[in-house]
């Protein structure tokens, strides 16, 4: 099963990549594809909408935080 999950990047300031990753992998493990970017400090978000919709159509489940980010961006699924 695939999940859309946040993967932490950045050492001192939290910056996250939104990735499609196998549910059995670690948070920092190998991802299937990078589908977005989230910076909570500067409140910036970049989403690759076609890639996100592709994974959602294939049955991927977003985590709670990713679900909130997608809802805020207006992605309907």
UniProtKB/Swiss-Prot annotation:
It is found in: Plastid, Chloroplast. Pfam families: Ribosomal_S16. The keyword Ribosomal protein applies. The keyword Nuclease does not apply. GO terms for molecular function: structural constituent of ribosome. Keywords: Chloroplast, Plastid, Ribonucleoprotein, Ribosomal protein. One of its GO terms (biological process) is mitochondrial translation. One of its GO terms (cellular component) is mitochondrion. Belongs to the bacterial ribosomal protein bS16 family. This is Small ribosomal subunit protein bS16c. It comes from Eucalyptus globulus subsp. globulus (Tasmanian blue gum). The lineage of its organism: Eukaryota, Viridiplantae, Streptophyta, Embryophyta, Tracheophyta.
């Amino acid at each position: 099963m695939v999940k859309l999950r946040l993967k932490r990047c950045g050492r001192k300031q939290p910056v996250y990549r939104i990735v499609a990753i196998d549910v059995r992998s670690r948070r920092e493990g190998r991802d299937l594809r990078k589908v977005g970017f989230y910076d909570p400090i500067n409140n910036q978000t970049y989403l690759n909408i076609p890639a996100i919709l592709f994974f959602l159509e294939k049955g991927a489940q977003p985590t709670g935080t990713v679900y909130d980010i997608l809802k805020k961006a207006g992605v309907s699924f």
